Amino acid sequence: MDKSNNSVADHYNKIKSISLCNREVSQIIGVREVNNFLKQRLIQKFIQQNSVVLDLGCGKGGDLSKLKHCPVRTYYGCDIAQDSLKEALSRSIGLKFKTHFLNANFASDKITIEEKADLVMSQFSFHYAFSSELSMKKAAMNVFNNLKEGGIFILTIPDTNVILRRSERNAVDGSFGNRLYKVVPSPSFYTEKSFGRGYKFYLQEALTGCEEYLTNMEYLTEFFKSKGMVKIFDTDFLSFINTEMFADKEMYSRMVKRVLTQEELPIIELYRAIAYKKN
């Protein structure tokens, strides 16, 4: 495991889970609610009956609750952070489907599960694979090799165009944000490379400057296309929420209790939801 991988693992191992009680007074509670709602809707859009699910970058298992009432047969959770996996294992107790956990880096290690997955997902984690072309290809091949024909790969990921546009508005150092979040470009951010363009992302109560990378979704889409996988869904989070809040009003009212504040909205606008299908 190289230095950058160690730093990511250490970073997420140190993040403390927020209890339901503390969540109510969280400064980014609106962001958490919207993100959870959109991840739930994305899963429901593409999950199949009796599904095998592979979760790349599963973290502490926060999305296990979103699969609880879905037609899942077997779940495989993969994460680089060992302490996070311990909590995920604890959260899996009592679920109706089988669960397996792998302590591995999906952007450098070869991931092999016992049976092909109907759904592979990577929620807010796949952008770490864009540290290099090699790591992106390894991550993409882990998706491709573990996905059955007709299976779907879903991911929620930062939008490079939004990040670049906001950074360009600050001619001094390219950083941007507000009281709740901040993006600080690293020297590599300003290169013309397709990979390894880094920035530090700070998010209140969640992220404290872990190095992240601009995504190159055009490259990923072409790479998948060469393997017989096609993009079938792509939308920014703001458009997604504006559609899904009306598509399932009951779920929206149950999961999203608050209106996003003016400081929370720019955080939501940083992300996209995307899906690919293996033909």
Model-inferred region functions:
Residues S135-E149:
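A short glycine-rich, Lys/Arg-flanked "PGG" loop and its adjoining helix->strand segment in the class I
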Residues K200-N279:
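Rossmann-like AdoMet/SAM-dependent catalytic core
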